[in-house]
Curated annotation (Swiss-Prot):
Record function comment: Thyroid hormone-binding protein, with a much higher binding affinity for triiodothyronine (T3) than for thyroxine (T4). Probably transports triiodothyronine from the bloodstream to the brain.
Protein's recorded name: Transthyretin
PROSITE patterns in the record: TRANSTHYRETIN_1 (PS00768), TRANSTHYRETIN_2 (PS00769)
SUPFAM superfamilies named among the record's database cross-references: Transthyretin (synonym: prealbumin)
Any one Gene Ontology molecular-function term assigned to this protein's record: thyroid hormone binding
Domains: entry comment: The N-terminus strongly influences thyroid hormone-binding properties.
Amino acid sequence: MAFHSMLLVFLAGLVFLTEAAPLVSHGSIDSKCPLMVKVLDAVRGSPAANVAIKVFKKTSDGDWQEFAAGKTTEFGEVHELTSDEKFVEGIYRVEFDTSSYWKALGLSPFHEYADVVFTANDSGHRHYTIAALLSPFSYSTTAVVSDPQE
């Protein structure tokens, strides 16, 4: 039984890696998109549509100020959250409303939210793809950081 569980986790991770980080397409399709979010449903093996996303920026006094918001498309993606001009160096938090997503599917999840906190643009201007693989009782995240393409 443990082998089957590990195999399932491995296969879900494989799907996640092949779907979550297309280095070529992000830069070429969204060359003006400095921050893109992608969400995958590990239970159904598909993009997670209609997941509410909020992005916060840490202020100089340590508080979090809402910076951007959106919902994932049928492809599990949120584009155009911000512009190159507004996405300056700083600490950001991406909040995934996982509870509402799972409850809409008739499941009772453990997490209310999944958060990813990261420092952006501290080594020069970059483009970021934040990807999350969700299940009702766990989540995993990864990031693809690339130089912007003209």
